[in-house]
Regions:
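Short, Arg/Lys-rich segments that mark the N-terminal edge of DNA/RNA- and chromatin-recognition modules
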Residues: 1-31, 234-236, 240-263
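N-terminal core-binding DNA-recognition domain of tyrosine site-specific recombinases/integrases
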Residues: 3, 70-160, 317-323, 338-344, ...
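Active-site/catalytic core of tyrosine-dependent DNA strand-transfer enzymes
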Residues: 14, 137, 261-268, 274-338
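Basic, Lys/Arg- and aromatic-enriched nucleic-acid-binding interface segment
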Residues: 124-128, 134-138, 142-144, 157, ...
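C-terminal catalytic core of tyrosine-transesterase DNA break-rejoin enzymes
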Residues: 157, 203, 207, 214, ...
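Catalytic-site neighborhood detector that most strongly recognizes the C-terminal catalytic loop/helix
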Residues: 173, 181, 236-238, 368-393
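C-terminal secondary-structure termini that scaffold catalytic or DNA-interacting sites
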Residues: 227, 235-278, 285-287, 314, ...
Length: 403
């Protein structure tokens, strides 16, 4: 069992551990007593779990650790969508590359070699991403690293290893591609070629900087017509049925019944992934007028038993992302505009607001719901690039062509 030893300006948690069959005493230093108490309680809970055999036998390989990690860390902590994506990464990449390796064999040097090897491996194909001879991307490797780093942080806590070999592992540089999106003038042209429902979806996405899942989750009750505001506090997602049944369902707000026979996925309204995604956005008066003209009879009472969604099929089921995408691409074609994704409207919105606000990143971030300002500043760079060309043209006009 662990104990706390008081020092001059710190506190040490002292306990016995076994590494590679050798029993030894370990000291961990904390600057405050509450931190030391929390660590002591963690160690005691782990000791109780081992004693009750809920963790299972000894964990010696990476594959065994990932199994315990999913059960003790993933299931109680992750949302269904996070569980589904992380399970996919673990299943497809981690056991094939390092599953049989013993935990004691991993070192920072070994991890660097493994990552170099993984970048030469072909990417796993899926119904959405065909293999096509492409290699594993740096972005995917970073996602794999995030899971492995977290798993080995728990392994240190659970006393399977002394230190995390994935800490400060060398990762490939991700060079983000410049994002293609429509200008405000092109969006005005686009809505002229859209049916009313699609036009409303474009207006809302552009004015409120919405993600696609946030747009399709909107209900009429989310709009405050007296204050011209829109409340964004949920998202529409399609999640594997197994993932929904495995993890805690506290983040799921509504589960839509399946259509037809038994399906492997389920459509749900769920809480957003981050707290910053929950926000209230002010809408322009012209858009509020359009919303008032579009709202159906009985919108005030809400949908029972299903939510009264703004974008839904006639039977009340939520509009699918594929339907929205298909209609959007058809409208782009008819308008003679370049092919971009529906999600790019969010980039158009953010860049336009940055330009209008003179680069007020904080104000735009509160509208977009980004947890970090990195994405905002990246788009701001593209806005500034256009401003630089405008400045050159103005310089030419005023200085060189003045005579």
């Amino acid at each position: 069992m662990a104990s706390i030893v008081t020092r001059k300006s710190s506190f040490a948690v002292v306990y016995m551990t076994t590494v590679n069959g050798v029993r030894k005493q370990k000291w961990e230093t904390y600057h405050t007593l509450p931190e030391a108490v929390r660590r002591k309680e963690q160690l005691e809970r782990y000791h109780d779990l081992r004693k009750s055999k809920k963790i299972g036998g000894e964990v010696e390989t990476v594959a065994q650790l990932m199994s315990v990690y999913l059960r003790l860390h993933g299931v109680p902590r992750w949302s269904p969508s996070t569980y589904q994506s992380n399970c996919g990464l673990i299943q497809h990449y981690i056991p094939p590359c390092m599953g049989d390796m013993r935990l004691s064999e991993l070192s920072p040097r070994t991890v660097a070699a493994l990552y170099s090897q993984m970048l030469e491996e072909p990417r796993i194909s899926s119904p959405y991403h065909k293999q096509g001879g492409q290699k594993l991307s740096p972005t995917t490797l970073r996602s794999i690293h995030k899971v492995l780093h977290s798993a080995f942080e728990q392994a240190v806590l659970w006393e399977y290893v002394d230190r995390n070999p994935f800490h400060r592992a060398p990762l490939p540089t991700c060079r983000p591609k410049q994002k293609a999106f429509l200008t405000p003038e092109q969006i005005k042209q686009l809505v002229l070629h859209c049916p009313p429902t699609l036009a409303l979806a474009i207006h809302l996405t552009f004015a409120a900087s919405l993600r696609k899942g946030e747009l399709l989750a909107l209900t009429w009750q989310d709009i405050d017509f007296s204050r011209n505001t829109l409340r964004i506090d949920k998202t529409l997602a399609r999640i594997g049925r197994d993932a929904v049944n495995q993890v805690n369902q506290r983040e799921i707000l509504h589960r839509f019944p399946p259509v037809g026979g038994r399906q492997r996925t389920v459509l749900v309204l769920k809480q957003p992934k981050t707290e910053s995604s929950v926000r209230t956005v002010y809408l322009p008066p012209s858009l509020m007028t359009l919303l008032k003209q579009s709202r159906p009879a009985g919108w005030e009472t809400g949908g029972q038993p299903s939510p009264h969604l703004i974008f839904a099929y006639p039977d009340g089921r939520p509009m699918q992302e594929c339907t929205l995408t298909k209609q959007f691409q058809q409208a782009l074609k008819e308008a003679g505009l370049p092919k971009v994704t529906f999600h790019s409207l969010r980039y158009s919105s953010i860049s336009y607001k940055l330009s209008l606000s003179g680069g007020d990143i904080k104000a735009v971030q509160r509208d977009s719901g980004h947890a970090q300002a990195d994405m905002i500043t990246e788009l701001y760079g593209q806005v500034l690039e256009q401003n630089r060309w405008d400045l050159v043209e103005r310089f030419e006009e005023v200085f060189y062509c003045a005579d």
